[in-house]
A protein has these predicted regions:
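Walker A/P-loop nucleotide-binding motif
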Residues: 118-134
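Phosphate-binding P-loop
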Residues: 110-118
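Post-Walker A helix-loop "phosphate-sensing" segment adjacent to the P-loop in P-loop NTPases
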Residues: 139-151
Length: 258
């Protein structure tokens, strides 16, 4: 009679392999494919039995976390209309082509503290000076940790007015959506004179309510703020209120040098 214990190592290994395969299947079923692949790869590596519990968890969870974070970032970029935009603020600095005021704006804005604190940013400069580039770069950085959205101001107002006329309940729902965003970017702000009272009301409502909720809004304009009131006809009160909220906290001026 030979003790059955001599076969235990092999049987234990088979049981462990079976259990690992079950865990891999369960992870795949939970749509945790990176964790499943990591666990399977680690188990078949020579160092598997030498890993302590914490190291094992780090190596199994790490790739899944990075994958999920990357997917969330890409999804946020698409929803924000920022996919394919500039992903770095490195080019937003004084050069032979353009200058920025204040000079320390990059250090101030790159932290994105203005979003967390609900402060508005106004980016001013002539056409093709780099306003959109800076705003989009900030928006893309924001998508790592915040919900953002980029719009051309005129298109935004036209769409919102049309929705308000067609279905007021859907309009209200859309307004609530914009109020929940951590960052709203309105490019080409007041590029042309607004004569439609409905557009003025929409712009005022969004700016006013976001300000009340301490939600950050970035506006980009090639016009000096002191001329904005003349761009919003027949409603001086709303014009002044919009001006006050858009320029209340932080202003960046881009000046071409050529």
């Amino acid at each position: 009679f030979f003790p059955r214990a001599v076969n235990l190592p092999g049987r234990c290994a088979m049981k462990k392999l079976d259990r690992i395969n079950e865990l891999v299947d369960e992870l795949n079923e939970l749509q945790l494919g990176c964790m499943a692949a990591s666990l399977d790869s680690l188990y078949h590596s020579k160092s598997f039995d030498e890993l302590d519990a914490v190291s094992l968890l780090e190596q199994v969870i790490g790739p899944e976390y990075q994958n999920k974070t990357s997917q969330r970032f890409q999804n946020r970029l698409k929803r924000a209309h920022l996919a394919g935009g500039p992903q770095s603020l490195d080019k937003c600095k004084d050069s032979t082509e353009r200058g920025y005021l204040p000079s320390d704006f990059n250090a101030t804005l790159s932290s994105l503290d203005f979003i967390r604190e609900g402060l508005n940013v106004c980016i001013l400069g002539p056409s093709d000076s780099g306003k959109s580039y800076l705003a989009k770069a900030l928006g893309i950085q924001a998508c790592l940790n915040y919900r953002a959205m980029y719009h051309h101001c005129e298109e935004f107002l036209e769409t919102m007015v049309a929705l308000k006329q067609a279905d007021y309940s859907k309009y209200q729902k859309k307004v609530r959506f914009y109020l929940k965003l951590d960052l709203l970017i309105l490019d080409d702000f007041l590029l042309h004179t607004i004569t439609d009272e409905r557009e003025i009301k929409v712009l005022f409502e969004v700016m006013e309510k976001r300000s009340e909720l301490s939600r950050c809004t970035i506006v980009c304009s090639q016009r000096e703020p002191n001329s904005w009131a003349s761009m919003i006809l027949n409603d001086e009160v709303s014009a002044n209120a919009i001006l006050k909220r858009a320029t209340k906290h932080y202003t960046v001026v881009i000046q071409p040098r050529n």
